[in-house]
Structures are given as C-alpha cells and as structure tokens.
C-alpha cells in the first residue's frame, strides 16, 4: 500500500511539474500572440502611410517616365505588402496551433491528475 501511494504521489508530482510547464507555455504563446497583434497593427499602419506617400508622389510626378516609375513603386509596395500579410497570417496560424496544442497538453495533464488523485483517495 505504501509503495502504491508512493508511486501515485511521485506521478502526481511529475504531473504537477508538467502542468506548470504547460501553463508557462500557454502564457508564452499568448504573449507571442499579443506581440503578433502589435506587428499586424504596425504593418497595417505602415501600409496606410505608404499609400498616402504614393498618392502624394503621384500628384507631383508628370510625364510618362514618372508615371511608369510610380506604377512600378505601387506594384513593388503591393507585392511587399502581400508578402508581409502572408507572413503575418502564417505566423498567426502557427501561434494558434501552438496555443491549441499547449491547451490540449494541459487538459490531458489535468485529466490524468484528476484520475491519479481519485486513485490516491481510494
């Protein structure tokens, strides 16, 4: 009986440590998501500022060469903006998956802990 209780107690301690690690991972992932939110807001703001600047430049440029260069800049800006958006979305998806995996791990540990505590009290 003492051996069984000792083994259960040891398993409960291991689960407790694993839960702390899983909770820390969840918190870290949430912090990463908050940082990602800030990056997305900054990216959106920069995109708006680039559009305003390109509109300003367009109004000052004249002639076919200037117009062609302006179109080139708009295309470059659009491509860069699309690449940034894709990258931000990929990172957002990765963080969502990471958070869900951490939550699943935590849930599994909590379930296992409850089962062991039930055994302990019997």
Region roles according to the model:
Residues 8-13, 44, 51, 89:
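Repetitive, compositionally biased segments used for assembly/scaffolding
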Residues 25-42, 75-115:
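Long amphipathic alpha-helical coiled-coil segments
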